[in-house]
Amino acid sequence: MTATRKINLISDPATTLLAQARWCDAFTSKLRGFTFRRHLAENDGLVLVEKEDGRINTAIHMLFVFFDLAVIWVNDAGQVVDTVLAKPWRLSYAPQAPARYVIEGHPRLLSQVKVGDQIRFE
């Protein structure tokens, strides 16, 4: 069973981005991600977790992903360092700055988050 976490945008007042995001810290759960799924619900999300900040280890692919994804890179301090609307079947997306966490979810997330925002995982 994969653990879940609540993802909050720290603002005044705090905004919940995803009430239950899959916490993917094992190789197999990170590899699987949203591949081979045909649909993405608005409240679906996952967090790919690395051991430390980096650019290469937090790069993602969109092979066998059939829908657009909001991708939000967050560093170890909880700061959003990059965002992108990832398109199906693209080979690679990498953050502009080192990150430890990669949040993937419905494209609507991009309207709620910007670089420099603070994120908290509960």
Which residues does each PLM region occupy?
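Compact, glycine-rich, soluble single-domain proteins
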Residues: M1-E122
